[in-house]
Regions:
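Extracellular beta-strand-rich solenoid/capping regions of secreted or surface-exposed proteins
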Residues: 1-35, 40-72, 93-97, 125-128, ...
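Residue-level signal for beta-strand positions within conserved beta-sheet cores that form or flank
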Residues: 6, 30, 88, 119, ...
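Right-handed parallel beta-helix
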Residues: 30-41, 73-85, 99-113, 129-142, ...
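Short, hydrophobic secondary-structure boundary micro-motifs
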Residues: 46-49, 115, 146
Length: 167
């Protein structure tokens, strides 16, 4: 099968808080992988910051409309994370000791609706154990507060060959 001609789309249809939510017990040599997906149209409409706890990780309903990764080891490869809108953390949230690799991904046209200072349109990492971003493009992500594109709290890893435009 040709993944370019036969795109696999995970579409939240503007009706879900997180199109993809990942948490799993961390074990040496084990990880979850998403490869070649388009993840789009996640849209949290909640103005409050309610949460659901899964495996000891709080998944906040207004954070990470496209992907929320909490306390798991995950590789996101060759994915497009696009057109997600959230109250506070637009497209991606990496949290609670998570270890994440983003490689050859496009993160574009995501936004946060919040006008507070605690928001980000693209990728927000706070409490992540390891975050690596390689060969990725971040473009046209919007936020009015802290970071339209990428916000990383603490030293969590490396970023190489990352293109940021119109954010």
């Amino acid at each position: 099968a040709d993944p370019v001609a036969n795109e696999t789309i995970l579409d939240g249809d503007h009706a879900v808080c997180h199109v993809v939510a990942v948490t799993a017990a961390k074990m040496n040599g084990m990880k979850a992988s998403l490869d070649g997906f388009t993840i789009k149209n996640g849209s949290s409409q909640f103005s409050s910051v309610g949460s659901t706890t899964i495996g000891g990780v709080k998944f906040y309903q207004s954070y990470g409309a496209g992907i929320f990764i909490g306390n798991a080891t995950v590789d996101i490869l060759n994915c497009k994370i696009v057109d997600n809108t959230d109250i506070r953390m637009g497209a991606i949230r990496v949290d609670a000791g998570a270890e994440a690799l983003f490689d050859n991904c496009v993160v574009a046209d995501n936004a946060t609706k919040s006008t507070t200072t605690y928001n980000c349109g693209g990728l927000w990492a706070d409490g992540a154990k390891l975050l690596r971003i390689n060969n990725c493009t971040f473009s046209n992500n919007k936020a009015s507060g802290v970071a339209p594109c990428i916000y990383v709290f603490g030293d969590t890893g490396g970023k190489t060959n990352v293109l940021i435009s119109l954010s």
